[in-house]
Amino acid sequence: MTDTNPENVNNSKITIICSAPDLASQNIKKHLLALREWKPLELPENSGFSAVLESADGKFRLVDIEEIHVFQDGLDKKLEAAGLPAELIIFASKHRSKEEVKSLTVHCTGNSSNEARLGGHPKELAVSSPPAMKSILMEMKRLAKVKGLDYDVTLEVTHHGPTELNVPSLYAEIGSTEGQWEEPVPGEIVARAILTVSLEKVPTAVGFGGGHYAMRQTGLLLETAISFGHNFPKYQLEFVDEALIRQAVEKSNAEFAYFDRKSMKSADRKRISQILEKLGLKVLKESEIREKYGREE
């Protein structure tokens, strides 16, 4: 549950977390500092944070940490204890992939299986922010086109930590190698996209199937009025049980579900459909989503 203390609610800000050892994080931070006026805030002793800045318009906080992002379980409580309650947590981060694809990515966090090697807890999902993920990804896409940046702009599936967060959160990333992490143009694009974030409610789905980069879900997010919360790729579906789906629906505030049908085994489709029916969620086909929710201009 998020804190309902009026003082904390009024003081809650969109909080951007920048990690000292993360080159992309520092690149994004440099551009955030250049794009807005910021004032330093005093930190209480032993807060665990290196520095905190607040934007002159009072909308954002920028928090420096010395550790990497994925192990920041309980960060929302730590921020609150330091008098810095968050309305939304955005991890400005690098993305690494074996394929070394140049990319700008957005995703929420969670562990579908009993493994939690990269932070978080097994079988636990963080609270997602579908409106924020949509607005940031759409602005990344727009700016990449304007600036002629030939990067993939994509939604990733739910993965890694932190998961122990009751405040909505997301990752905004530059991928996938050191060369890209320090490039000025991607850093500026991610920073600008973060600063245009919207929390206005949008029709939201949970997604099942597809690969790590959730291509069909990305297309629907960019081309219609909907967004996605948690997404589970085809290679994780064996771990997706009723408890995890219930978590995904609740922590995405989802109204319906979407299947990348061709990528899913029929047994998984049937099993997950039955669970969703029990939870009162319809599965909409891509054609139904496009017809009902139209296209973004």
From Swiss-Prot:
Domain of life: Archaea
Residue ranges of coiled coil: none
Keywords: Hydrolase, Metal-binding, Zinc
Reactions this protein catalyses: a D-aminoacyl-tRNA + H2O = a tRNA + a D-alpha-amino acid + H(+); glycyl-tRNA(Ala) + H2O = tRNA(Ala) + glycine + H(+)
One Pfam family recorded for the sequence: tRNA_deacylase
Subunit relationships: Monomer.
Cofactor: Zn(2+)
PANTHER family, A to Z: D-AMINOACYL-TRNA DEACYLASE
Function, in words: D-aminoacyl-tRNA deacylase with broad substrate specificity. By recycling D-aminoacyl-tRNA to D-amino acids and free tRNA molecules, this enzyme counteracts the toxicity associated with the formation of D-aminoacyl-tRNA entities in vivo.
Cofactor note: Binds 2 Zn(2+) ions per subunit.
E.C. code: 3.1.1.96
Protein name: D-aminoacyl-tRNA deacylase
Family recorded in the similarity comment: Belongs to the DtdA deacylase family.
An annotated GO BP: D-amino acid catabolic process
GO molecular function, one term: zinc ion binding
InterPro entries: Deacylase_DtdA_archaea, DtdA
